[in-house]
Amino acid sequence: MSTEDNKRLVLEFLGHYSAARYDAALDLLAEDCTWWLPGHPEEFPAAGSVDKATVQRRLAGNLKLLPHGLEITTGAITAEQDRVALEAESRGTLVNGREYHNSYHFLFVIADGKIRRVKEYLDTLHAREALGAARASR
């Protein structure tokens, strides 16, 4: 795929994610996809690298915490060879009524027309506090 095709694939994935069309988003991930988040699991439980099945479970959990979805707005995007780097912001209303807003930098690796690897950088402290409070309110 060309770098433009890779960018389109990533933007399509994030469009599905933002619209809570998680099955369509998952279809764009390779079966052996890994998704990595920074941090230490004892401080940020989502930290580390997970497989596609775990990503699927986490997406299902998102709907419980963010019943109206998580709108993702994309910013700068750069592609080279099989990699796409992208800045983004998210906004959504948590189940406890609080607003959730975070900033991200993603690195996607594309292979055979699918997303093979994702590295997601975000404010893990904010995510832990906001999402933890939403879980506790359910």
Regions found by a protein language model. Give the residues of each.
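A beta-strand edge to alpha-helix "cap/lid" segment located at domain peripheries
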Residues: 2-5, 60-138
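Short, low-complexity N-terminal intrinsically disordered segments enriched in polar/charged residues
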Residues: 1-31, 133-138
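A solvent-exposed, acidic/Ser-Thr-rich amphipathic alpha-helical stretch
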Residues: 31-81
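Amphipathic alpha-helical interaction segments
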Residues: 22-25, 43-44, 112, 129-130
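Hydrophobic pocket/interface hotspot
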Residues: 10-13, 25-26, 33, 55, ...
